[in-house]
């Protein structure tokens, strides 16, 4: 089988898209300490990727938000800690999931060394925007 994504036309004109795990496609990421493996579903309609880290998160990501309608995350392996705009903190383990509305500020603060996460954004991710922490006085 080819190492390229296989596209099969359907009667509707849409295509089934297959990306074999044996030939992963990695995209440049928003963070140097994460690896972003793009999944077939990323064909412009949504962003779907598996995020991993080689040594665990060594520093927080910093407060940011994503330009999308929804961000769904599902922890495949390891752990993830993050702070949310509403003041809550979440500790996630394998099997946990979280749905964030687009534009919600958050900050990943730590991961385990074996961290692996499925992330889906609808519609596709249009950008990541660094921002001040919630409640900070932006006039200073």
Predicted regions and their residues:
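Double-stranded beta-helix
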Residues: 2-19, 107-140
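A short glycine-rich, His/Asp/Glu-containing loop-to-beta-strand
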Residues: 25-63, 69
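Short histidine-centered beta-strand/loop micro-motifs
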Residues: 28, 60-67, 84, 90, ...
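Residue-level detector of conserved, well-ordered beta-strand and adjacent loop positions
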Residues: 40, 76, 93, 101, ...
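Short strand-connecting beta-turns/loops that link adjacent beta-strands
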Residues: 44-45, 87, 113
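Short, conserved beta-strand element in jelly-roll/cupin
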Residues: 51-54, 65-82, 120-123
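A generic structural motif
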Residues: 70, 77, 87, 103-105
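Short acidic-glycine-tyrosine-enriched beta hairpin
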Residues: 86-103
